[in-house]
Regions:
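Hydrophobic alpha-helical segments at protein termini of multi-pass membrane proteins
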Residues: 1-238
Length: 238
């Protein structure tokens, strides 16, 4: 028998590692640890909140309950996953930052958004890994792809959220981008995987998985650039 704490640890460690990573990136002017813990724990609440958005969409038929076609896969990816999940995260981020006196630098928006996003990803990972017969395989694949994906969506959300906060003249545009950019990237990520599930073509599956791998590299590169632009010493470059 495998001790329960092993699957649990394997599910949580990727999120913890990325939380430490973003904290280290902000080491020149770090946020209070208790604030980051609060943001991460509140991020966990974005899972039930996202279900409050996705369930009605499924109930009225906008999001199919099962996927049979490419169209179904795309609708589930964008409307059943990316839209409700990123909306829920943005709402939690707004709660965290609306009266936060520590939100005084552009990098802070990224740090808090990543904490919220990894709170979501941590619980989601636990739900996927715990109880799965192949928990080691699931934990490994999600540690490489899914959790870093949520990290990247959080970086972009925080990047634009900070611009909206510190550039009042373009607030509406940047706030719109704070939700549009994560939804598009999250939707593309899920759509590729969901299309692989429904296709019967082995060649298409291979091509899509190659595209998926390249897209994951693109995601990480984009997130890394966003972090560099918002680091305190680089503010003038944005």
């Amino acid at each position: 028998l495998i001790p329960m704490y092993l699957p649990l640890l394997s599910a949580l460690i990727p999120a913890i590692v990325l939380l430490v990573y973003i904290y280290w990136q902000d080491r020149q002017s770090p946020e209070p640890v208790w604030q980051l813990i609060k943001a991460t724990l509140l991020g966990v609440l974005s899972i039930p909140l996202s279900l409050c958005i996705s369930s009605p969409l499924q109930a009225i038929g906008i999001v199919p309950e099962e996927m049979f076609t490419f169209g179904d896969a795309i609708r589930v990816a964008f409307l059943g996953a990316a839209l409700p999940e990123e909306l829920a995260k943005l709402f939690i981020l707004w709660l965290v930052l609306r009266k936060n006196r520590f939100f005084d630098e552009r990098m802070d928006g990224i740090v808090y958004a990543v904490c919220v996003s990894l709170g979501f990803a941590g619980l989601e990972n636990v739900l996927y890994v715990i109880g799965d017969a192949d928990w080691m395989g699931v934990a490994l694949s999600r540690a490489i792809f899914a959790v870093p994906g949520h990290f990247c969506y959080g970086v972009l959300m925080g990047y634009f959220y900070s611009l909206a906060h510190f550039c009042p003249s373009k607030r509406s545009y940047y706030m719109a981008m704070a939700i549009i950019a994560p939804i598009i990237l999250h939707g593309i990520y899920d759509a590729i995987l969901f299309i692989v599930r429904v296709t019967i073509s082995e060649w298409l599956s291979v091509i899509l998985m190659l595209i998926f791998t390249l897209f994951c590299f693109y995601l990480w590169k984009t997130a890394s650039k966003a972090i560099k632009k918002h680091l305190p010493s680089r503010d003038a470059m944005v």
